[in-house]
UniProtKB/Swiss-Prot annotation:
Key enzyme in the regulation of glycerol uptake and metabolism. Catalyzes the phosphorylation of glycerol to yield sn-glycerol 3-phosphate. This is Glycerol kinase. It comes from Rhizorhabdus wittichii (strain DSM 6014 / CCUG 31198 / JCM 15750 / NBRC 105917 / EY 4224 / RW1) (Sphingomonas wittichii). Pathway: Polyol metabolism; glycerol degradation via glycerol kinase pathway; sn-glycerol 3-phosphate from glycerol: step 1/1. Its EC number is 2.7.1.30. GO terms for biological process: glycerol catabolic process; glycerol metabolic process; glycerol-3-phosphate metabolic process.
């Protein structure tokens, strides 16, 4: 009897497999981290074969812990780190190079060249996205231009392009022996190659970026029967859901009505608001993106505020500065001081994303005195997450005309109660943590389960959602205003830090 649904959650730092029951409760979970590869400053890579091996390992471990087999699963869904891009040989299954991670900035020179003719928003009307190092099109262009033989193989169709969802789906459904090469609308919308209105690859964009159509995956719905898994230990299970991680969290938080929003605190942070069946064009620095598409229903769209570095700042304090041994320890260190000591951190390690979109911004620690100590640095790091989200919320309210009444949250950092209270204080609005915080994986499970009738519809998914904790604002308005002014001053020190060389004369489009 197929009593459960499985979800592969392939993230920036680790791969997980989670088994959910009909109420969205977790039956079993297994997780394994993969290496972060930094060949040069600004370059970030992952080994696709390591990710694939880890994914298969955690699937087996989770099933074993629950004493289950593939036959016990009604369906399996995939959710993944978005934009991270790779090219692989369809005959051997070997990647042509490491995957270029979403936060990798090596395409900065290409971005500047394309901006010369039409500016940062040159393609925004069609794609919903500004020209930035974040998105997949120029990552693929870089691979085609810099990896030996890549362009010829891509043009012939021997090399296949994909984000991580495509890579996993292709391998799970057979790989070189008939694996399906596809991606869902949410992941496709992050490539800068898809027309938002049609949900199809756009020939003009392909020509402009120099991308051969032969290497691209087929674009499919987020919730549908995509294929049968043909590799152990899920051999025979149905692959029926694919969602980019932030869209998956939107689904997992049951944000199915226009105006409903969630924020995920992870390596970066991502605020998404459902805008319904029509895309809303941002005038305040947000992204217009796909929210999801269930079967033959019209696609749903979202506004997104993407923040590159939040949880990654905590990792940096741990790994590069050695302020603590494990990430959760930052809360105790931050609580060792009563306030931030007027220290502010702008973690622009990969430039600044929404609403600034400045690839030349760099990280800043401002306000240091001899009084400043480790506790102040830790507290400022947590507060930086809240300040960045407030910037995005202000932009989203300006675009949507909707005042955020309550913030639904998820992701690893929601366990940090000091951060959650400070977030409520800075927003001036309640912050809510749901009972089930693994909403990214849950969203992928929901998409898969809906496709096979395991759940009857979105109302049943709404009924699964419930509140675990709520934080309400208590900060005096004068202190909030002081923090806002100081944060804006620190942002000003970060913007435009890199002096750009004169762009090359050759025209790329």
């Amino acid at each position: 009897m197929t009593q459960f649904v499985g979800a592969i959650d392939q993230g920036t730092t680790s791969s997980r497999f989670i088994v959910f029951d009909r109420h969205g409760a977790i039956l079993a979970v297994a997780q394994k981290e993969h290496r972060q590869i930094y060949p040069r400053p600004g370059w970030v890579e992952h080994d696709p074969l390591e990710i694939l091996a880890n994914t298969q390992e955690v699937i087996g471990a989770a099933l074993a812990r629950a004493n289950l087999t593939a036959a016990d699963l009604a369906a399996v869904g995939i959710t993944n780190q978005r934009e991270t891009s790779l090219l692989w040989d369809r005959e051997t299954g070997r990647p042509l190079c490491n995957a270029l991670v979403w936060m990798d900035t090596r395409t900065d020179e290409l971005v500047q060249r394309y901006r010369r003719d039409g500016g940062q928003d040159r393609f925004r009307d069609r794609t919903g996205l500004p020209l930035a190092t974040y998105f997949s099109a120029l990552k693929l262009r870089w691979i085609l231009d810099n990896v030996d033989g890549a362009r010829a193989q891509a043009e012939s169709g021997r090399a296949l392009f994909g984000t991580i969802d495509s890579w996993l789906a292709w391998n799970l459904t057979g790989g070189p022996d008939g694996g399906v090469h596809l991606t869902d609308v949410t992941n496709a919308s992050r490539t800068m190659l898809m027309d938002l209105a049609t949900c199809r690859w756009d020939d003009d964009l392909l020509a402009t970026f120099g991308i051969p159509r032969a290497c691209l995956p087929r674009i499919v719905a987020s919730s549908d029967l995509h294929g049968t898994i043909r590799t152990p230990p899920l051999d025979g299970a149905r692959l029926a859901g694919i969602l980019g991680d932030q869209q998956a969290a939107l689904v997992g938080q049951a944000c199915f009505a226009p105006g409903e929003a969630k924020n995920t605190y992870g390596t970066g942070s991502f605020l998404l608001m459902n805008t319904g069946t029509e895309p809303v064009r941002s005038k305040a620095g947000l992204l217009t993106t796909l929210a999801y598409r269930f079967g033959d229903e019209p696609p749903r769209y979202a506004l997104e505020g993407a923040i590159a570095i939040t949880g990654a700042l905590v990792q940096w304090l741990r790994d590069n500065l050695g302020l603590f041994d494990s990430a959760p320890e930052i809360e105790a260190l931050a609580r060792s001081v009563p306030d931030n000591g007027d220290v502010y951190i702008v973690p622009a390690f990969s430039g600044l994303y929404a609403p600034y979109w400045d690839d030349s911004a760099r990280g800043v620690i401002a306000g240091l005195t001899r009084f400043s100590n480790r506790g102040h640095i830790a507290r400022a790091a947590l507060e930086a997450t809240a300040y960045q989200l407030c910037d995005v919320v202000a932009a989203m309210e300006a675009d949507s005309g909707i005042r955020l009444a309550t913030l639904k949250t998820d992701g690893g950092m929601v366990a940090n109660e000091l951060l959650m209270q400070f977030q409520a204080d800075m927003l001036g609005a309640p912050v809510v943590r749901p009972r089930i915080t693994e909403t990214t994986a849950l969203g992928a499970a929901y998409a898969a389960g809906l496709a096979v009738g395991y759940w009857s519809g979105t109302q049943e998914l709404r009924d699964n959602w419930g509140v675990d904790a709520t934080w309400r604002p208590t900060m005096p308005a004068e202190l909030r205003a002081h923090h806002q002014r100081s944060w804006k001053k620190a942002i000003g020190k970060s913007l435009g830090w890199i002096d750009r060389p004169q762009a090359a004369a050759d025209d790329v489009g």
